[in-house]
Amino acid sequence: FPNLDMHAAGLGRFRSRYWEKLHDVLDAVARREGAQFVRWLFIRFPAPQLSFAQCRKLRDRFREEGKDGLSFHYLEEFLRHRDLWAALWRHLRLCWASLRLEKHARPAFHFAGSRLNFWDYAKGDWAESFRGWRGLERCLQNRAFKSYAHCAGPQRWTLFPLENCPWERMLTQAAHEAGNGPVF
């Protein structure tokens, strides 16, 4: 939980310093409608603030209290056994494709009219994105988002912070493919 308000968490309330006053707006709507409707989906990033075990305990407490959302899940909870195999197969296909494309991409890594080639600067990112842990992680996340969208079903809307992260596109696509409603 990066940016978690630890004081509120100690009281069983989920409050992110990232979302700030949006929590109050969502709570007001829930009170007006008589029930919580927000489904919180967390993507785990290692952080010094809390261990994974502590994060799970907080998530469980937020679920028990039920004050700030209808559900609280980590993305990885939606990975099924078959998703692991499908993601691994997709990752292997990307590995093979990147190796085939690399011989064509390497000479193309320059601006038009320039002979300065940027391949030496980008080759590590290329390899990590297609053949490394990041590539496999993205394949797993893509499967998990599709599973989440299917499980969540139609929603009023899906909202996420626009930080230009690869997972944002995956969430958007999964929600649209599942017909879950608008994405903001």
Short names for language-model regions:
Residues 1-184:
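Catalytic-core helical/loop segments in enzymes performing group transfer/polymerization on anionic/lipid-linked
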